């Protein structure tokens, strides 16, 4: 608990003890009134102060005003009737403060997940000067400076490892508990915790432009983007509160006047009591508090899972998504070419890969890199001579004295070497050694391990249609879509075509149905901005993705998309539950109070009880099912 919460709890305990003691103490008259007033001021002085400040600032109709009028009125009525029963006035204030404390605790609990994210903010950076480590403000570190990150410290700025190796804990950024190993030459993202070895990192960005700064700015600004539900409740409260105040005034005045006109006793005390009870019942705290809290808890729960939502308006829009459009590369596939098969080779597969990797050793093409990775050993260029790169065909070289050709079917035809066609999906590298066909190697963009499961999870989460956009050839795109179960695929698209295709898909949406576009943040900014909701995957370290997207997934796990949608559904469900429950109980109790069938204790339940239940329901949004 915070210092403020502890102080409030102490006031509640003191007031409760004093109220219980006064109930049994045989004191009467002015002494009794004085003791009850002291108890009332202990528990309610801050509410009276806020109500007074509100009146002075022209903001009369709020919950503080309602509580102040109701409790002061109850005191005045008890004094007028000389009943000495001041318990109800104090009980109303006491239980109201209990509700406020509970609400404060709930907000604090939901802030913990945001605070955990805020813990990624580094306090300092280590710079080596004259053989000693000096701590400096991260803002003062220039781009290109070598900083030292010791075990247990956070990486303060994005950079590249120039010395050392270690294991990083990225859970605060991605929600993923599995550590990541880094070595010399690997990129480091600010906010990660160094767990084992000492790392020397050359910074590639200024602190203000680093990943951690971008994320913190995003989270800090999320509360400023209100959902339609929050706007509705805020507008509703601005109209509702004055209406019920005037309604209470009418309830206190009109029935007695009508009775007097009819020649009956006005029963002023009875109707004023009902009006005061009406005010307590009508307090809109349950709605005003629980609705923003539900969204706040939803955003907090999502952030704990490595899902950063820029505002409650995006959370609300996400709950209405019925079409999810993927940019294939980097979302459903890894975007990295890998050797997936070796066919029709009488030669040992590893030997064929060795010939291919050595023949392609002078090329920086992604296909060449994938062959070298599949070979898995250091390339000895002294074994290779006479390398010739034939544009659009492949390469020829002499490896260990053997003529080697590696390329497409055109190269085989040019060399007059018979070859086998391949029906596998991917890029086919035909190999010839010593003028004889040696087989072919299949290279393709690898589908992510959980991509198929992610598409299925989206349908279970209420998504009606999944669409894949790609610049790949139709054969490749159709094969990936069929493997993953994607409903619709559009292939051979240029970057500009993707925006047009999303425009077309948006035009097909009906009613409140929304469209989400999922990209990896690379060249996706126009499409991310055009969709109803833009989701960037694997955005750790991508400034463009964090800027352009409405929702940022900090790792590249496609299952996170369905999880984000489930979080939004749960959050919006809680919001609607609270609205219906609070309004139903409020209006029912208001009617019962007006006709004299509910007293002040029923009003306390309608106010504090409903608020506590609504807040309890709201903090359910913090819990995210795995």
Tell where the protein language model's regions lie, with residue ranges:
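Conserved cytosolic catalytic loops of P-type ATPases
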Residues: 116-209, 313-356, 398-399
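Conserved ATP-binding TGD loop and adjacent catalytic N/P-domain core of P-type ATPases
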Residues: 401, 427, 433-577
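Membrane-water interface of transmembrane alpha-helices in multipass transporters/channels
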Residues: 29-37, 60-68, 81-92, 232, ...
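Conserved catalytic phosphorylation-site environment of P-type ATPases
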Residues: 57, 63-71, 173, 273, ...
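P-type ATPase nucleotide-binding
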Residues: 339-465, 474, 486-502
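Soluble-to-membrane junctions at the N-terminal ends of transmembrane alpha-helices
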Residues: 1-16, 34, 48-75, 216-250, ...
């Amino acid at each position: 608990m915070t210092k403020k919460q502890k102080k409030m709890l102490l006031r509640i305990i003191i007031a409760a003890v004093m109220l219980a003691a006064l109930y049994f103490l045989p004191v009467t008259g002015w002494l009794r009134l004085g003791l009850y007033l002291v108890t009332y001021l202990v528990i309610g002085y801050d509410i009276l102060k806020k109500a007074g400040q509100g009146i002075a600032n022209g903001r009369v109709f709020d919950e503080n005003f309602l509580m102040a009028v109701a409790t002061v009125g109850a005191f005045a009525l008890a004094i007028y009737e000389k009943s000495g029963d001041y318990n109800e006035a104090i009980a109303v204030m006491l239980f109201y403060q209990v509700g406020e404390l509970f609400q404060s605790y709930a907000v604090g609990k939901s802030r913990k997940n945001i605070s955990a994210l805020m813990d990624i903010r580094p306090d300092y950076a280590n710079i080596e000067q004259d053989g000693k480590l000096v701590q400096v403000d991260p803002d003062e570190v220039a781009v290109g400076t070598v900083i030292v990150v010791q075990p247990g410290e956070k990486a303060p700025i994005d950079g590249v490892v120039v010395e050392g190796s270690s294991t990083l804990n990225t859970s605060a950024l991605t929600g993923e508990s599995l550590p990541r190993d880094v070595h010399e030459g690997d990129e480091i993202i600010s906010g990660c915790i160094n767990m084992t070895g000492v790392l020397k990192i050359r910074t590639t960005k200024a602190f203000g432009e680093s990943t951690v700064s971008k994320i913190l700015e995003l989270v800090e600004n999320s509360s400023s983007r209100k959902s339609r539900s929050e706007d509705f409740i805020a507008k509703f409260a601005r109209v509702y509160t004055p209406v019920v105040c005037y309604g209470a005034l009418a309830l206190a005045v009109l029935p007695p006047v009508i009775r007097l006109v009819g020649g009956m006793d006005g029963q002023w005390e009875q109707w004023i009591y009902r009006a005061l009870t009406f005010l307590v019942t009508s307090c809109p705290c349950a709605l005003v508090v629980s609705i923003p809290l539900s969204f706040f808890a939803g955003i907090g729960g999502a952030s704990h899972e490595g899902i950063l939502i820029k505002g409650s308006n995006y959370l609300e829009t996400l709950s209405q998504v019925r079409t999810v459009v993927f940019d294939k590369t980097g979302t459903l596939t890894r975007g990295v070419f890998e050797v997936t098969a070796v066919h029709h080779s009488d030669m040992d597969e590893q030997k064929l890969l060795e010939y291919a990797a050595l023949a392609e050793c002078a090329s920086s093409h992604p296909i060449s890199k994938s062959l070298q990775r599949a070979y898995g050993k250091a390339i000895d260029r002294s074994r290779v001579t006479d390398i010739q790169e034939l544009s659009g065909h492949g390469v020829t070289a002499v490896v260990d004295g053997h003529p080697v050709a590696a390329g497409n079917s055109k190269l085989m035809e040019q060399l007059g070497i018979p070859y086998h066609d391949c029906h596998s999906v991917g890029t086919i590298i035909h190999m010839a050694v010593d003028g004889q066909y040696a087989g072919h190697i299949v290279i393709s963009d690898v589908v992510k391990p959980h991509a198929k499961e992610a598409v299925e999870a989206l349908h279970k989460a209420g998504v009606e249609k999944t669409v894949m956009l790609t610049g790949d050839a139709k054969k490749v795109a159709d094969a990936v879509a069929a493997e993953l179960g994607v409903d619709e695929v559009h292939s051979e698209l240029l970057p500009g075509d993707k925006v047009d295709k999303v425009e077309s898909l948006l035009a097909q949406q009906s009613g409140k149905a929304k469209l989400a576009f999922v990209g990896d943040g690379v060249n996706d900014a126009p499409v991310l901005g055009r969709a109803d909701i833009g989701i960037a995957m694997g955005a750790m370290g991508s400034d463009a993705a964090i800027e352009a997207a409405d929702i940022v997934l900090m790792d590249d796990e496609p299952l996170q998309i369905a999880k984000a949608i489930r979080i939004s559904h749960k959050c919006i469900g809680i919001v609607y539950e609270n609205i219906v429950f609070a309004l139903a109980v409020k209006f029912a109790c208001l009617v019962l109070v007006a006709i004299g069938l509910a007293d002040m204790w029923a009003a306390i339940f309608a106010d504090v009880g409903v608020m506590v239940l609504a807040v309890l329901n709201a903090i359910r949004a913090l819990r995210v099912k795995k």
